[in-house]
């Protein structure tokens, strides 16, 4: 995440915090990557109303997946209310990353020189970008900074309906 707080620590998001060294290796590899982080995934949310609507119009072959998503949403919302005091929806973290790989126009990106803090007690897993005129030595990494969240949710749901 560039501008948001973390979701597993004050500064780190789960997919980076679980293995910051691996993430830093990817960032420094020179590969052409786009990071779809909390800056955009927290703004792209699936609601139970979306799943209720899908239940009424999904393809028969998709019924088991939609039923599973409804059950998972109930479980997710219960845990999220307990831990984070959030209610009513589910950020589309990994689904949005996959959708952006297929449809990059869902997001606007910015390139920044970036590294991942691999040590530290409080900042382990934090993505560090250097915006100074002469930034530290690092590769440019593309970060999703804006998202068309309504379009993303519609595109996700369109896979399931007839």
Report the location of each language-model feature.
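Active-site glycine-rich loop that binds ribose-phosphate moieties when present
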Residues: 1-28
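Conformational coupling and interaction surfaces
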Residues: 14-17, 33-162
């Amino acid at each position: 995440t560039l501008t948001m707080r973390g979701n597993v620590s004050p500064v780190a998001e789960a997919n980076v915090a679980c293995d910051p060294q691996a993430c830093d290796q990817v960032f420094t590899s020179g590969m052409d990557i786009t990071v779809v982080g909390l800056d955009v995934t927290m703004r792209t949310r699936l609601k139970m109303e979306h799943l209720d609507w899908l239940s009424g119009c999904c393809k028969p072959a998709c019924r088991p997946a939609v039923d599973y998503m409804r059950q998972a949403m109930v479980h997710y919302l219960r845990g999220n209310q307990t831990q984070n005091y959030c209610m009513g929806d589910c950020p589309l973290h990994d689904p949005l990353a996959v959708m952006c790989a297929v449809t990059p126009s869902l997001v606007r990106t910015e390139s920044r020189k970036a590294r991942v803090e691999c040590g530290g007690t409080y900042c382990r897993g934090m993505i560090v970008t250097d915006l100074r005129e002469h930034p530290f030595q690092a590769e440019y990494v593309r970060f999703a900074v804006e998202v068309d969240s309504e379009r993303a949710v519609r595109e996700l749901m369109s896979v399931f309906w007839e």
